[in-house]
Amino acid sequence: MIIDTHVHIGTGLGFHMTEEDVIYSINKYNIDYALVSNTEAASHDHQRKLIPCELQKTQLQCLERAVGFARENKGRIGIMHWVKPMEDITPELRNMIENNLDIIKALKFHPYHASCSFTSEESKKYIHLAEEYNLPVVSHTGTGYDDNPMRLFEMAKRYPRTNFVMVHLGLGSDNKEAIDLCAKAQNLYGDTTWVSTASALEFINKCGDDRLLFGSDSPIDGKDTYLNNGRGDRSLYQEYFNEFREVVSAETYEKIMWRNASELFNISLK
C-alpha cells in the first residue's frame, strides 16, 4: 500500500495540475490514497511578489474545489487545506472545515508563497485552529527565513499537543539541519518530497522510522511525476518504489510508505 501525503491540484505559478491528472497518476502508479492541497491558495509568486488580486482566489474557494474532488473520490482522496494566513478565519471557513472533517486531514502552510513567516501571528491563528480541530499542521520548508525548518521546530516546541510535518526537510538543503531538529521534537515529522533516499535513511537512523512520510508533489512534473521528472529523467520516486525497499526492513518500508500517514492523518485503508 502507498499513501502519498503531498499531492496537488491547481492552476498558477506556472503549473496546471488537474483532478484528472491526479486520478490518472494514482491509478497508474498504484497509489492507494492521496492527500491533496490546492495551490491556487498561493498569494505570492516564485519571486515572492504579490499575485494581482484579480488573479487570486480566496482560501474558501480553494477549499470548495478540493472538497468537491475528495467527495467525488471518497476513500482515495483526502484534503490538506492550504491556508492563506493573511485572511481572517471566517464563520464560512469554519463551517466548511467542520462539515468536512471526515476528508480534511490537515492544515497546510506554504510560508514562501504566502510571504509570511511560519512563526508570525497570522500563522499562529491557524495553528490554533488546527489545534482546535485536532488536525496536524503541514508546512513547506526551504532555506529562507520564513520557511526555515527552525521555524517549524519553534512552533512544534510551542504547541506540543499538535503534530507538525516538515515537508521537504528543507528544500534545497542537504536536509541535515531539518533531520537534527526532528530528532529533538517528537511531534515533528518529515516527508520525502524531493528528499533523497540517502537523507531518508539518515532520518531513520537519527529519528527512527515512525515519523517519516512518503510524499511526492505529484503531478508537479506532469501526470507521470512518479516515473520521470520534467526533463524526462528517472524520477526520484522510482527509487522509493524500488531500491529503497531493498535497504530497509519490510516493517520500516510499510511505515514510511503508508502506516505512519494512516496513523497521523487518521486514514483508514480497506
Give the residues covered by each predicted segment.
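Hydrophobic faces of well-ordered beta-strands that scaffold small-molecule active sites
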Residues: 3-7, 34-36, 77-81, 105-109, ...
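Active-site gating loops and adjacent loop-to-helix segments of metal-dependent hydrolytic enzymes
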Residues: 29-56, 101-104, 162, 218-222, ...
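Active-site gating/metal-coordination segments in enzymes
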Residues: 49-138, 184, 188-189
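Active-site acidic short loop of glycosyltransferases
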Residues: 31, 75, 132, 161, ...
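Distinct, well-ordered alpha-helical segments
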Residues: 89-98, 117-126, 145-159, 174-182, ...
